[in-house]
């Protein structure tokens, strides 16, 4: 072991690790895209074979499609794992940075404590806590207001999306029903005739009772 070898910097190690995982993820995504292209071609081939009436060949191609889709699913799982590892590594680096920052802050506070009067320091800390509490309250109120506004917008957007989706799904049925349904004027005339005949019949019965 070379005692003069420079100890790797954690940030450099993280950067190299991220680069390797990014390359691996891109390779997986490229392979997924290639298999998905093959999947589309295979689906078209299955349709053509089915139309020709070749049942045996259609079943063989269908089995190939199942295996192909399983390969795609496996690669997608590997891609998700790579991304999870990258996220975990980044989080570990963040925790390390926080720990280093806290260590530096502790040293700074210790140095300041030596040069500050305890009573004055206590007063500064109380004022700091007071201002921090006010800032937290203001931030929380602003956050609640923003969340309420976003929730309303999201609810409206989701409702609009669901409405459009339902209309798209039943649009053909509505069109066919409208094309076969009687026109509004004709329907209205029939309803009016039925209503008038009912009223006339009721008047006749009342006249007979008199």
From Swiss-Prot:
Keyword match Metal-binding: no
Skewed-composition ranges (Basic and acidic residues): 9-23
Keywords for this protein: Coiled coil, Endosome, Protein transport, Transport
Principal location class: other
Region described as Disordered: spans on this chain: 1-23, 178-200
Coiled-coil region: 28-84
GO cellular component, one term: ESCRT III complex
Subcellular location: Endosome
GO BP annotations listed: protein transport; vacuolar transport
Keyword Coiled coil applies: yes
Family per record: Belongs to the SNF7 family.
Function per UniProt: Component of the ESCRT-III complex, which is required for multivesicular bodies (MVBs) formation and sorting of endosomal cargo proteins into MVBs. The ESCRT-III complex is probably involved in the concentration of MVB cargo.
Oligomer and partners: Component of the endosomal sorting required for transport complex III (ESCRT-III), composed at least of VPS2, VPS20, VPS24 and VPS32.
Protein name: Vacuolar protein sorting-associated protein 2 homolog 3
Species name: Arabidopsis thaliana (Mouse-ear cress)
């Amino acid at each position: 072991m070379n005692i003069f070898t420079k100890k790797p910097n954690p940030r450099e190690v993280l950067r190299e690790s991220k680069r390797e995982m990014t390359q691996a993820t891109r390779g997986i995504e490229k392979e997924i895209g290639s298999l998905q292209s093959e999947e589309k071609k295979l689906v078209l081939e299955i349709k053509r074979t089915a139309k020709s009436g070749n049942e045996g060949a259609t079943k063989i191609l269908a089995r190939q499609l199942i295996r192909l889709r399983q390969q795609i699913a496996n690669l997608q799982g590997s891609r998700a794992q790579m991304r999870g590892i990258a996220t975990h590594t980044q989080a570990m680096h963040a925790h390390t940075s926080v720990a280093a920052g806290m260590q530096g802050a502790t040293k700074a506070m210790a140095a300041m404590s030596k040069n500050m009067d305890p009573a004055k320091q206590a007063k500064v800390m109380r004022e700091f806590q007071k201002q921090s509490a006010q800032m937290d309250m203001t931030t929380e109120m602003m956050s609640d207001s923003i969340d309420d506004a976003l929730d309303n917008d999201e609810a409206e957007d989701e409702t609009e999306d669901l409405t459009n989706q339902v209309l798209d799904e039943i649009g053909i049925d509505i069109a066919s029903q409208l094309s076969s349904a009687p026109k509004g004027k004709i329907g209205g005339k029939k309803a009016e005739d039925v209503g008038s005949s009912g009223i006339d019949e009721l008047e006749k019965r009342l006249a007979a009772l008199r």
